[in-house]
Amino acid sequence: MKVYAVGGAIRDTLMGLPVNDVDYVVVGSSVEEMVAQGFRPVGKDFPVFLHPETQAEYALARTERKTGKGYKGFHFYADPTVSLEEDLERRDLTINAMAQEVGPDGKWIGPIIDPYNGQEDLAAKVFRHVSDAFAEDPLRLLRIARFAARFPEFSVADETLFALKAIVQSGELSALSAERIWQELARGLVAHKPMHMFQVLLNTGAANTILPSTLSALLVEESFREGLIKSLEIAGNSLDERCAIVLMDLPASEIRSWADTIRMPIEVRDFSEIFSDLRVLINQYPDGSYQAADVLAWFNRADLWRKPDRVQMLLNLAQKLGLPVSALILAMRKAQSLNTADIIAGVEAQDRSNGERIGGAFESARLAAITAAINLDL
């Protein structure tokens, strides 16, 4: 029985990057032996165990065979006779198919085991798939796209690009779960260069399947891509902000439809939708001479009265992008400064239990405050 650290931990160590998680593979052991040594089985589809002390995950070396559609359509075979090289062969990229033995004290020992020339591709900064089985797993396309965003200095090998296109042409992308699509896209969005992820989706033909149709069409235009790169660089690495920037040229209805399809978290979806509505409002009044009723409608849509921090984030993002929102910021502050007690006191005593009358009084007061702010800004 031998234990090896494998995959991303080896890659990141060789690149001089911090290692947060380590995947361990056990060669020459069985389920019975692992349990006897105190490991707790947790894997549903293949033998994975938690270390009795560190709780780190250890997987038995395994091979796989395609039996159905999608990234779950595989039959795994784990046995003491499966070698480390056979286990590494099923991995996606050569740079992720390296290993190093782990000694009894937990320290990595001996040379890097690199049967598929991962170190060579790492030095050349190339994403190259390990074997022909690569094209059997559609999730790998999204992983490569995400890796491209994380490691923008890398290029995709020609033969790997061909394999990625084969995944798209096979129709296997339709078998991916909505949750996994969002998970990979979200990780790519907050990576170093998100545009590289979208470029992979474009180059492979996957954009039309994975992304909203309007966004896919826009990404074909070089001017849009250049503008998107600049906007993403201006914004921080907040997922909410980056997602909103990518989707800001789409109508809110299309954002909602796509977000629901890929199970985007509600708070991220709402932020993107409301920012899209803000863009519409700004474009409607390019000279900044807003109509108070339209501004109030957006404040209500953004739920300023219960979520002021979110509205502040939206306006701050617009300001960072150079959009004319000074009047809106002033209007927000004026509307927020209204005294609730004074508004209620202005309602006839007999109507103060009438929710509709109270609501109308607040709308009128807010509208007046916004009007004053807009006139002050002009």
Report each predicted region and the residues it spans.
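Catalytic cores of the polymerase beta-like nucleotidyltransferase superfamily
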Residues: 1-378
